[in-house]
Amino acid sequence: MSREATKLWKERNPRRIWAHTACKSARHRAKKKGVPFEITTDYVESILPDECPIFNTPLKYYGNKVAGELSPSLDRIDPAKGYVKDNIVVISNKANTIKSAYKSRDIFIVAQWLKGIEDGGQS
């Protein structure tokens, strides 16, 4: 394939490129962390959602480029189980950043506080 044809193919297949890049990065992280890695580019591509399942916002697939909080992110539901089919999901970079930075209990407490403010409560 010529350079121009390769460039055109990449522009037309951003989801495939993202899945390949995500798998390659996940394989490296799995080896570094000593966790299982059993996924393929085809599998990751098959589970790519159009929207973040947490925020219900459209995901932006730009091949191997990060497009900010709307970029897709490969998440391990249980980090100790590694990258296996029943343990990965694609969510937004925003959702994954929040998920990995805070414990669910902390997120819940902040959500309750915000709900109280929205309902007319005191801060």
What are these regions (language model features)?
Residues 1-61, 66, 84, 94-98, ...:
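Contiguous alpha-helical segments
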Residues 67-87:
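Short linker/helix segments within small regulatory modules
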Residues 74, 91, 120-122:
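Repeat-unit-sized solenoid/scaffold elements
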